[in-house]
């Protein structure tokens, strides 16, 4: 491990705090913790990084490493060499069978994966060639989250160098909008409704009080995802249904549908909303997308579709020098207005800080006013900048708003 430590000493430490999350199986977690916690204690002491491992009896656990860049990379180095040591000690099935490479699975917000892949895959190819490690970005989101798994495998030295380069990319490209963190034990979303109509944030993110949740809604025009409306006491989803319709460019509709409809099915399941994508009209450059459900379901579906669009645009990239087109982005009026807004869910504009929830710097969350045929009073319609694939400007019309 001396060679890796020397590399850490050569690199100047950045004056920032870095948080790296890794997805590990139970056997790997047991190896990192060690007997009576001795191994993880030693890693903490020698690296000076803060290391936490999520609780739970599920097969997978989240290991979170926080600290200075040097501390985090030192901890990753020790973890990689420990896993390599375990592989060397494992009995081989055959004399000529080569042992598998060390593998780490990083958990990264989907909005940052586009920068990691680069235009036409140039960035990830560069990382593979310069580090000698194998890097694979998962095509699908981790369940009930807006994060993806990035798998890094190879010898420990290659993995450490690869993790450095990945961290450099994500530090230069902060996540866009709110991030729904992945938690292996969750099955109903990150924010779940409790029996007293308060929303509790699962995992190591603290608790949001019922009073705060009544005001917690939009971040830059997009609602923070809640649980399925069927979980709300006293709220009958069938009587609270409304619809929103918007347009998505033909060249981006594929990322919303996914391979064999996998992505749109995932969004339907997570949001609880009914999503219909209209047929392509002759000569039209857009497709009609209709979301039907409760305001909460619509807001979550809207957020997840936006995440798909942003990831697709950042991955494909725009034409150099092309100017973005300003597109008005308000949704069309609800087809069926909400009869009576439950007092425990909707309220007037309000801001609270939930930095622990999204794991980022404090960001104000703005309330979503009750559904109405027009834009809410006091809030101006916002616009989205979207560059056309061929660099030309598109005519102004109703568009889906990126977050």
Swiss-Prot record:
Q: Which residues form a coiled coil?
A: none
Keyword terms, alphabetized = Cytoplasm, DNA-binding, Repeat, Ribonucleoprotein, RNA-binding
- Output the GO biological process annotations, alphabetical, semicolon-separated: negative regulation of mRNA splicing, via spliceosome; regulation of transcription by RNA polymerase II
The answer to whether the entry has keyword Secreted is no
- Tell me where in or outside the cell this protein is found: Cytoplasm
- InterPro entries in the cross-refs: KH_dom (IPR004087), KH_dom_type_1 (IPR004088), KH_dom_type_1_sf (IPR036612)
Keyword Ribonucleoprotein present in the record's keywords: the answer is: yes
Q: Name one GO cellular component term.
A: ribonucleoprotein complex
- Name all KH domain ranges: 17-67, 101-154, 241-293
**GO terms of molecular function:** DNA binding; mRNA binding
What does the UniProt function comment say about this protein? Single-stranded nucleic acid binding protein that binds preferentially to oligo dC.
Protein known as: Poly(rC)-binding protein 4
Q: Which organism is it from?
A: Bos taurus (Bovine)
